[in-house]
Amino acid sequence: MLDRLYAIRSIGAKALLGALLATTVILAGCGTSSNAGTGGSGSSSLTACQATVANITNTTGNPSQTPTAPSAGVSGSISADGSSALQPLVQAVAAVFDQGNGTHSSINAGGSGKGLTDVNNGAVQIGMSDLYQSAKSISGLTDHQVAVVAFTLVVNNDIASKVQNLTTQQIKDIYAGNVTNWSQIGGPNELVTVVNRPTNSGTRGTFEQYVLGAKNEIPGNTLTQDNTGAVFQAVTSTPGSIGYVSTGFVTSSSASGSPAPICIDGYKADATDINSGNYKFWNIEHAYTKGPATGAPKALLKFLESSAVQTTLLPKLNYYTLTSIAQTAIQSHTSSSDPAPESFYSGS
């Protein structure tokens, strides 16, 4: 009789220990552990962290205010193209600048590679890029670092409640074409559709460098879109899809059924996880000129780097100031082979 009692107690203790361990896996939430959501393919890792529009929104500064551009004594036109992640900010700043100065600005996307090539060839006055010029084997341009952009993976709304977090290894497997159905990593039985960007994209370059570990994307079922907005729309309309966008496209969308942001290794695309070094999918935004900036482009860049813009339009469009990001984090995303940038920040 005593032997049976001891056996029952032993089984009960083991069951309790197992339950506690299972609870620990499920409760490994955002930012609570460097191992949160990693390892294994069970469904618990897919819900170990939840990124929302609210918790990836930059709430600093005065985003409700619109700056006024002082007269800079310049005229004529300003041309820029390149990064579709940086375009919304430069476009918004240029609109205010044009109103105060009578200039005419044309701010287009096309990808960071195009921006660097076009400014180098003299096709535009400003080349917008998420990457350093050396990443595209270009040299001799003058860098102006104007903001920090956070990127996030997003999934179609139909799987948003079941896929909220992916480990780096799971992401690598998806983008290598090894995972083609969400059920392979504990998700729903639904085909994975990868919505990506062309090779000249700075967002893609950032993703490959800081998430895939410098590996190229070779997914199976793929849709390629030319700009960030097109990626956002494609993920919105394609069941089972996943893609990457700058967080401003997520926080500025109020449409029902919009793609949902997800965590990486239990961390989300916000300043806290960027500053801790745990979230690496972000980059410094560059506005390149051919030689030191002059004339109207210089005046526009000075306005962009002014506190009037940095404290209003940056947070409104969900960018971060460089000074709000820890120096250790900035250094981890700085190219040692590129020259120091030209700066128009106050006190510089």
Task: List each language-model region with its residue ranges.
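N-terminal targeting signals for export/organelle localization
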Residues: L2-D3, T38
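Exported/periplasmic ABC-transporter solute-binding proteins
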Residues: G31-N120, V124-Q125, S129-S348
